[in-house]
């Protein structure tokens, strides 16, 4: 329900920040990497947010990009992965390296994140690869209405573009990655994997 | 609890929009038809809303008119119909065609909406017709206090006017529809049906 | 959690109003008598509120005075009385006549409210009388810190004053009612009953 | 989720205050000692807050310092201690005397708080001492990123500094207390205990 907060940064803690919006201070759980990258308290900040609703708690989680938030939400969909663990994965690995690891089926790198054992790493691997495929099928049915992305290129490229956007990449990031592919004679899945590999290595 | 949002349109997705109100971005689920009809991001928009509260989620659904929201709420009252399916019905058919279909007992048109099979279509048909009748009985007991609608015309017309208003039509829409009826020697139910048919064919 | 709303009155329905505060429209359930007493849409209104939290709904109830809200909250504490019924009692009888009825043990008047049968009326009678007594015991232990009410008069009068304030009367209303009592040689309970009778007959 | 409220003080009750922020009045449960210490209604106030979420209630609790709120949250973690009892402990004893009592294992002073019997006092004692130790272990792993505290002094002092800050003391309070210790040749736990004793006696 709450998509973002834009307000005055008031306090920075190791794993949370407080942002004031209109006289109300919102405590937002963030990865330590994001907390360390924020400006000095007093400056205006913009955080993409996810509102976690439980029977006995309302908690807000914050991200610097839609890309990170989308990865967080996909991780939340994996059985046994709660918001804090999902936040740790996004915070420690960063989304680009996460997708690159998923493509390489590199469970090892996932287990470097506190709270992720071999079993959870495998489950993340299986479910996120599956979602990656599904993401393309769902997306190809409804090409994005936003940002007037030109639907001129071939069907596979457009599907790949839509899939990358629905993973949280901006249209510009997605288009640039696709344009840098040496071989574009691939199906949508192949284009997405190749683009993710390129962005994962940046 | 939250009846509407008035703020800056920030992002448009295929099935959701983000509206900023006072530094907070609210993500609102909307039918694709509404998403496509909104102005450019940056403009001010007004959405009638419904706040769905569940044990693990707070979700906001948005509408361009009280008419659509009222239909959505009545659909929500039908067993087995959740917010997303109700939104799909309102988005795909539009409220006028929905009421016209209910009057014609046309379950076929309901099944064109993804997520609605024959069984759900029949249940919607039965329950919404029943509600339509009840709507009139309840409404006739308490004529609307809003908009100073002149209670001069006959009792049946006033009941029909109140029923149409409680279905979400504005007083002006309801009065115009009743005034265009060739035969006004009907009881309240008859007047309502005839008016809905006229508005359903527009 | 939400004690009041102060904003622009946008819409008035038979049993609810919509108040805009900072770009958000809040739908507030109110008694018809309050809806009918509000100014024209567009004016600024102030409503004391109660936020009802349930597993599948957040609903706001509105009152024109703390007195009405306090009575509503005490009614909510009676087994089997939900917010809508409590609102109907406060709306139909008004708090002063409610307390006068409780003192006279007049269950008949309670049954004139839709949704209140003889059994519920008796339960309301018993529980509110009991609360009335408890209210005084609790209150007498902690005299109000607000409004600098002079604690010069006798102990019984101060206890009665505190009890009336905790029932939602303003300090001025409570003091005036006590000052109009012909016989003030009563204990706190007697003073409260007598004052309620006077205010109930206004 | 809601870290603080900054707004106009509207009403003061024995155990709650109402603060207006942007047209909405928020009712905040506070200890009587805090209610009595607030300025006149109409002035701007700042309260650190805790939003308690239950299936049938959203309640806000308020504090004048992070120190008090941190103690409140640690008390909430003790089995059988709810928000009102935790608020009563913080309100009656004050956080400094609470920590001093925990260090002295003085359960007697805890039982002076309404709602705290010998059994709860013992449980608070055991669990808060345990948390105190844990607090240091957890904290020493992630030295605070806030307020650029110079990490020049010895490792034990920095761990003690971080532990005191995570208990809610400001960096300045923590550093001053450590600087006043006659004997600083202690491990982190010893430094923390000594500092708490000094601050507890102020």
UniProtKB/Swiss-Prot annotation, chains A, B, C, D:
Query: Which keywords annotate this record?
Result: Cytoplasm, DNA damage, DNA recombination, DNA repair, DNA-binding
Q: Taking the first listed entry, what is the main subcellular location of this protein, grouped into a coarse class? A: cytoplasm
- Show the segment(s) annotated as Domain I: 1-64
SMART domains membership: HhH1
Q: Which InterPro entries match?
A: DNA_helicase_Holl-junc_RuvA_I, Hlx-hairpin-Hlx_DNA-bd_motif, NA-bd_OB-fold, RuvA, RuvA_2-like, RuvA_C, RuvA_C_sf
Output the NCBIfam families linked to this UniProt entry.
Answer: ruvA (TIGR00084)
**Description of its domains:** Has three domains with a flexible linker between the domains II and III and assumes an 'L' shape. Domain III is highly mobile and contacts RuvB.
Q: Under what name is this protein listed?
A: Holliday junction branch migration complex subunit RuvA
- Organism encoding this protein: Desulforudis audaxviator (strain MP104C)
Gene that specifies this protein: ruvA
